[in-house]
Amino acid sequence: MGIVEPGCGDMLTGTEPMPGSDEGRAPGADPQHRYFYPEPGAQDADERRGGGSLGSPYPGGALVPAPPSRFLGAYAYPPRPQAAGFPGAGESFPPPADAEGYQPGEGYAAPDPRAGLYPGPREDYALPAGLEVSGKLRVALNNHLLWSKFNQHQTEMIITKQGRRMFPFLSFTVAGLEPTSHYRMFVDVVLVDQHHWRYQSGKWVQCGKAEGSMPGNRLYVHPDSPNTGAHWMRQEVSFGKLKLTNNKGASNNVTQMIVLQSLHKYQPRLHIVEVNDGEPEAACNASNTHIFTFQETQFIAVTAYQNAEITQLKIDNNPFAKGFRENFESMYTSVDTSIPSPPGPNCQFLGGDHYSPLLPNQYPVPSRFYPDLPGQAKDVVPQAYWLGAPRDHSYEAEFRAVSMKPAFLPSAPGPTMSYYRGQEVLAPGAGWPVAPQYPPKMGPASWFRPMRTLPMEPGPGGSEGRGPEDQGPPLVWTEIAPIRPESSDSGLGEGDSKRRRVSPYPSSGDSSSPAGAPSPFDKEAEGQFYNYFPN
């Protein structure tokens, strides 16, 4: 705001246009639109602008324009004249005659004249959240809002033997550095208090004294240190690679990990150190070191999350945890929604979306696999073969969550299956042949398969001289002679005589035969045995 030009006096009610002459200016005042309180004898009462009509804090106060400032408005009242004997800027202007022994009135605090007209920020001015000032340097916490969310529930940080990165991590924006000077930036972690903490009844409480100082690294230097001020100010200063560990004897990547104790509260701090030429980096003087602390970055070191709210915040905001959650949900929710439920209890649940190239029927009836099961409904319409795999089909996997790519199956000729008679080998591009659903009717003894027999020949008349009572238990089942399926006879008598030939007991009077042991080849046993396999 500059000087009010003549003719614009109607801008402020009750004031006169400000003269453009040098009358009324205090001697020695700079011409940069800055005005001081005029001497009482320099002008009459009509030229004393303000006159209390605009609410001047004292009689005769004038509302004067002020240059643009960060803390004061465009118009401000000049300082009240001070009593004689004040050193500094007040001595340049003689006080009024009636100002001897003047004391500031109640409710008005006179500024220190030694500080000048604009001494600095007001006492009631507070820095915005997430901003810290040290000298000329200003540092802002970039993810301040995220840290504040965690701080409402007391932030927890996982520490492991291998080291775990912080989330939220520390990220800053720095301003006020000398572009050509070199600076070194690092973060250290210090204890907030001398207490041991425990999560109890849904909140963190103090329990006992903190343990002694644990040996280990407590400092993490930014990889870009040292560097120029222009380098630090043109980009984000991130400490995302900082890891926290509880391994006291950590030797690998010791410069990237900070050793902490579990169930202790810590406060990270940012250090900015100006590095002079020829000065070792380890030297840190108080004159060239600036420390910035943000209260919302306090955390408690834990080996496992204690508060469920913190766990949920980590899942919702951590990009790695969020990706894991999306993959987990897509693997299970997509299958449940895309594949319908079976239409009935007799249907077998097979994923048609995933296996449609191999199984054309999504819900095959179990009677197709077990035709003789009682209580199973028969298929009304004959279905085509489903055991033969079609050629030149790709496995269209739909597990997109695990990033699986479709794999093309080789088109090698499949083995013939003798179970279905008359099956034709499908050529590429050929249609599926229609065949009966059930296998052809087999003979009565088709269930029996030839087995290996002993190389022994029966003697002449062996089968006619022995009765059923002379039989004994066979040595093993593999010694039973095979029954030829092409014979029209059922083979019961022949099988009976051959089983008597291989009996280890030659007669019933032999003492080596077990007494009173029932023979497994009596008539009742034979009836039960052959009734199990109906013709």
From Swiss-Prot:
InterPro entries per UniProt: p53-like_TF_DNA-bd_sf, T-box_DNA-bd, T-box_sf, TF_T-box, TF_T-box_CS
Record PTM: Phosphorylations at Ser-53, Tyr-77, Ser-225 and Ser-513 are regulated by mTORC1. Phosphorylation at Tyr-530 is essential for its interaction GATA3. Phosphorylation at Tyr-220, Tyr-266 and Tyr-305 enhances its transcriptional activator activity. Phosphorylation at Thr-303 is required for its interaction with NFATC2.
DNA-binding region in chain numbering: 141-326
Region of interest: Disordered: 1-62, 83-109, 449-535
Sites bearing Phosphoserine, chain numbering: S53, S225, S513
SUPFAM superfamilies, alphabetized: p53-like transcription factors
Subcellular location, principal: nucleus
GO MF annotations, alphabetized: DNA-binding transcription activator activity, RNA polymerase II-specific; DNA-binding transcription factor activity, RNA polymerase II-specific; DNA-binding transcription repressor activity, RNA polymerase II-specific; RNA polymerase II cis-regulatory region sequence-specific DNA binding; sequence-specific DNA binding; sequence-specific double-stranded DNA binding; transcription cis-regulatory region binding
Superkingdom to which the source organism belongs: Eukaryota
Location relative to the cell: Nucleus
Covalent crosslink: Glycyl lysine isopeptide (Lys-Gly) (interchain with G-Cter in ubiquitin): K314
Phosphotyrosine, modified sites: Y77, Y118, Y220, Y266, Y305, Y530
Gene Ontology biological process terms from the UniProt entry: cell fate specification; lymphocyte migration; negative regulation of DNA-templated transcription; negative regulation of interleukin-2 production; negative regulation of T-helper 17 cell differentiation; negative regulation of T-helper 17 cell lineage commitment; negative regulation of T-helper 2 cell cytokine production; negative regulation of transcription by RNA polymerase II
Annotated site (Essential for its interaction with RUNX1 and its ability to inhibit RUNX1 transcriptional activity and suppress TH17 lineage development): Y305
Ranges annotated as biased composition (Low complexity): 503-520
Keyword Ubl conjugation: yes
Pathological condition linked to this protein in its record: Asthma, with nasal polyps and aspirin intolerance: A condition consisting of asthma, aspirin sensitivity and nasal polyposis. Nasal polyposis is due to chronic inflammation of the paranasal sinus mucosa, leading to protrusion of edematous polyps into the nasal cavities. Immunodeficiency 88: An autosomal recessive disorder characterized by the development of disseminated mycobacterial disease following vaccination with BCG. Clinical features included fever, lymphadenopathy, and cutaneous eruption.
Function comment: Lineage-defining transcription factor which initiates Th1 lineage development from naive Th precursor cells both by activating Th1 genetic programs and by repressing the opposing Th2 and Th17 genetic programs. Activates transcription of a set of genes important for Th1 cell function, including those encoding IFN-gamma and the chemokine receptor CXCR3. Induces permissive chromatin accessibilty and CpG methylation in IFNG.
Record text on subunit structure and interactions: Interacts with RUNX1, RUNX3, ITK, ABL1, RELA, CDK9 and KDM6B. The phosphorylated form (at Thr-303) interacts with NFATC2. Interacts with SMARCA4 in a KDM6B-dependent manner. Interacts with CCTN1. Interacts with USP10. The phosphorylated form (at Tyr-530) interacts with GATA3.
Protein name: T-box transcription factor TBX21
